[in-house]
Amino acid sequence: MPSQKSPTKRSPTKRSPQKGGKGAKR
């Protein structure tokens, strides 16, 4: 799970899709 925080904080573009696809990414 710590890996998800790294890419999310580094890539501001990934923050957008992760907000709506948080359950799909998990």
UniProtKB/Swiss-Prot annotation:
<keyword id="KW-0238">DNA-binding</keyword>
<feature type="short sequence motif" description="SPKK motif 3">
    <location>
        <begin position="16"/>
        <end position="19"/>
    </location>
</feature>
<keyword id="KW-0597">Phosphoprotein</keyword>
<comment type="subunit">
    <text>The nucleosome is a histone octamer containing two molecules each of H2A, H2B, H3 and H4 assembled in one H3-H4 heterotetramer and two H2A-H2B heterodimers. The octamer wraps approximately 147 bp of DNA.</text>
</comment>
<feature type="short sequence motif" description="SPKK motif 2">
    <location>
        <begin position="11"/>
        <end position="14"/>
    </location>
</feature>
<comment type="similarity">
    <text>Belongs to the histone H2B family.</text>
</comment>
<keyword id="KW-0158">Chromosome</keyword>
<feature type="modified residue" description="Phosphoserine">
    <location>
        <position position="11"/>
    </location>
</feature>
<feature type="modified residue" description="Phosphoserine">
    <location>
        <position position="16"/>
    </location>
</feature>
<keyword id="KW-0832">Ubl conjugation</keyword>
<dbReference type="GO" id="GO:0005634">
    <property type="term" value="C:nucleus"/>
</dbReference>
<feature type="region of interest" description="Disordered">
    <location>
        <begin position="1"/>
        <end position="26"/>
    </location>
</feature>
<feature type="compositionally biased region" description="Basic residues">
    <location>
        <begin position="7"/>
        <end position="26"/>
    </location>
</feature>
<dbReference type="GO" id="GO:0003677">
    <property type="term" value="F:DNA binding"/>
</dbReference>
<feature type="short sequence motif" description="SPKK motif 1">
    <location>
        <begin position="6"/>
        <end position="9"/>
    </location>
</feature>
<keyword id="KW-0544">Nucleosome core</keyword>
<dbReference type="GO" id="GO:0000786">
    <property type="term" value="C:nucleosome"/>
</dbReference>
<protein>
    <recommendedName>
        <fullName>Histone H2B.1, sperm</fullName>
    </recommendedName>
</protein>
<keyword id="KW-0539">Nucleus</keyword>
<comment type="function">
    <text>Core component of nucleosome. Nucleosomes wrap and compact DNA into chromatin, limiting DNA accessibility to the cellular machineries which require DNA as a template. Histones thereby play a central role in transcription regulation, DNA repair, DNA replication and chromosomal stability. DNA accessibility is regulated via a complex set of post-translational modifications of histones, also called histone code, and nucleosome remodeling.</text>
</comment>
